[in-house]
Amino acid sequence: SVSLAAAGHPILAIPAAMAAGACAGFVTAFLQTKLGVPSILAGIVTNTGLYTINLMAMGWSSNVNLLKQETIFTKFRALNEFGGWYEFVLAALITVAAGAVLIWFLKTRLGLSIRATGDNRDMVKASSVNPVLTVTVGLCVSNALTGLAGAVVGQMQKSADINSGTGIVVIGLACLIIGETVVGKGSGLRGVLAVILGSVIYRFLYAV
């Protein structure tokens, strides 16, 4: 995302980052479903390969900055509607939009099948649902959202570092635990709200 933004395409960088994330999810799913690689190991293998791919996308530099380049945030600031809150407002709009789409998707037939696969894969298979498809789509969607988040954060911070994702899995789990403690478990709506609220609370506590 930052590399495309540095090349003068900040808006195009967002869907490009999501597509790249979906491709990474597909590779992880392929390793799991077709090659029989355990899920944790498949994620590690994919993440290791992505390190080199990210370096190549960043022009073989460990850090890329956008200090003198346009981003989606500078374009949004040009509207002169929200003053100094423009970054918060745009990030919130993107978060709400992504959350709404995810909630809708999880209520579709495919979305319900993905959720059921996570609960009981054997039951899903017995119900004539292909678990390979649900695992693949689930990983593609989740990694696309990861790409979206990384793209937005990179453009907001006006920089990208090759090591910026270090420890993000632990942080994500912490956010999820905090969110589920506050919101509780249950429907897809609660799950999405738990992730968003948990992330906000975690960052607030981290800043304090």
Where are the model-predicted features located?
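Small-residue-rich segments of transmembrane alpha-helices in multi-pass membrane proteins
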Residues: 1, 45-54, 126-128, 173-176, ...
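Membrane-interface helix caps of multi-pass small-molecule transporters
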Residues: 3, 7, 26, 30-34, ...
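Membrane-helix interface residues
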Residues: 8, 35-37, 108, 129
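Alpha-helical transmembrane segments within multi-pass membrane transporters and channels
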Residues: 10-48, 93-99, 197-198, 202
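Transmembrane alpha-helical segments in multi-pass inner-membrane proteins
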Residues: 15, 146-208
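Helix-loop-helix "hairpin" substructures at the membrane interface of multi-pass membrane proteins
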Residues: 15-16, 24, 83-169
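Transmembrane helix-bundle core of multi-pass membrane transporters
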Residues: 39, 50-107, 137
